[in-house]
From Swiss-Prot:
Chief location: cytoplasm
Statement: the UniProt record of this protein carries the keyword Methyltransferase: no
Modified residues (Phosphoserine): S4
Similarity section: Belongs to the protein kinase superfamily. CK1 Ser/Thr protein kinase family. Casein kinase I subfamily.
Subunit structure: Interacts with the Axin complex. Interacts with TUT1, leading to TUT1 phosphorylation. Interacts with FAM83A, FAM83B, FAM83C, FAM83D, FAM83E, FAM83F, FAM83G and FAM83H (via DUF1669). Interaction with FAM83H recruits CSNK1A1 to keratin filaments.
Active site: D136 (proton acceptor)
Membrane-spanning intervals of the chain: none
Gene: CSNK1A1
UniProt-recorded Gene Ontology molecular function terms: ATP binding; protein kinase activity; protein serine kinase activity; protein serine/threonine kinase activity
Chain positions with N-acetylalanine modification: A2
InterPro entries: CK1_Ser-Thr_kinase (IPR050235), Kinase-like_dom_sf (IPR011009), Prot_kinase_dom (IPR000719), Protein_kinase_ATP_BS (IPR017441), Ser/Thr_kinase_AS (IPR008271)
Name of this protein: Casein kinase I isoform alpha
Any Pfam family matching the protein: Pkinase
Subcellular location: Cytoplasm; Cytoplasm, Cytoskeleton, Microtubule organizing center, Centrosome; Chromosome, Centromere, Kinetochore; Nucleus speckle
Length: 325
């Protein structure tokens, strides 16, 4: 990293985490690889300028604390202020599903999609049990772990998450119809496009679009051109509403259309039947005679890349293996 002013050269946060290099961007801040100088352990650090117009890292850190201990939720090491930044130190994770999709030439086998679907449904269900909805379900926000957690899927980036019911009374937030679209238009639910307050059903519908994105390589409402962001969102919304689920899922097992139709049929306050949705895909998985052995498409590719690297003096591996946050 250059030592010009404004760089993070010799930037130590929380007294012991030394920033190494930028590895990504979240919804509201940059993410850095850092090293714990007391034991050499690598961690991830999310930085947000204290001058940010809509600071949300403190909010996100509180959310992670509420979610701590859940499977596939990164562990928070430290939150505080350093120089002009709000700082969140957390577990270092592996590549996102978007990174891995690109690494696999934007093709996932049905086996990989179904193994992912199982973990993704469980991650979202856990967040919902803690009285929050994520509101930005997309491939970029699901990351694989590293080391002994390399087959475990993690859900990250809770900057847009919202409490949908009271912890004590279990009172659900009220239905509203004047909301701006929160999240990523490509994966947004139809109701989110229509300005309806989001609830559990919307996270689940978004996941349905993510799964079909992996199946199809792209969604019919991708690549639409428009003069303004607002017009683009309008076009995406129109295309989404005019594409029947059966057309979207044509050529793929009926379970994907069943999943989406189920999610779209949920009422605003209704709890999704997560087990039913997992079972849809688990039974399909068994019908297709797959083994749940955590051998994903990238597992094979990485092994091949590692073998090639080993035979060519061991230099090429990093270039071929997705890294980063």
């Amino acid at each position: 990293m250059a030592s010009s002013s404004g760089s993070k050269a010799e930037f130590i946060v929380g007294g012991k985490y030394k920033l190494v290099r930028k590895i990504g961007s979240g919804s509201f801040g940059d993410i850095y690889l850092a090293i714990n100088i007391t034991n050499g352990e690598e961690v991830a650090v999310k930085l947000e300028s204290q001058k940010a117009r809509h600071p949300q890292l403190l909010y996100e850190s509180k959310l992670y604390k509420i979610l701590q201990g859940g499977v596939g939720i990164p562990h928070i090491r430290w939150y505080g202020q350093e120089k002009d930044y709000n700082v969140l130190v957390m577990d270092l994770l592996g590549p996102s599903l978007e990174d891995l999709f690109n690494f696999c030439s934007r093709r996932f086998t049905m086996k990989t999609v179904l193994m992912l679907a199982d973990q993704m449904i469980s991650r979202i269900e856990y967040v919902h049990t803690k009285n929050f909805i994520h509101r930005d379900i997309k491939p970029d926000n699901f990351l694989m772990g590293i080391g002994r957690h390399c087959n475990k899927l993690f859900l990250i980036d809770f900057g847009l998450a919202k409490k949908y019911r009271d912890n004590r009374t279990r009172q659900h937030i009220p239905y509203r119809e004047d909301k701006n679209l929160t999240g990523t238009a490509r994966y947004a639910s139809i109701n989110a496009h229509l300005g309806i307050e989001q609830s559990r059903r919307d996270d689940m519908e978004s996941l349905g679009y993510v799964l079909m994105y992996f199946n199809r390589t792209s969604l019919p409402w991708q690549g639409l051109k428009a003069a303004t962001k607002k017009q683009k969102y309008e076009k995406i919304s129109e295309k989404k509403m005019s594409t029947p689920v059966e057309v979207l899922c044509k050529g793929f097992p009926a379970e994907f259309a069943m999943y989406l139709n189920y999610c779209r049929g949920l009422r605003f306050e209704e709890a999704p039947d997560y087990m039913y949705l997992r079972q849809l895909f688990r039974i399909l998985f068994r019908t297709l005679n797959h083994q749940y052995d955590y051998t994903f498409d990238w597992t094979m590719l990485k092994q091949k890349a590692a073998q090639q690297a080993a035979s060519s003096s061991g230099q090429g591996q990093q270039a071929q293996t997705p890294t980063g946050f």
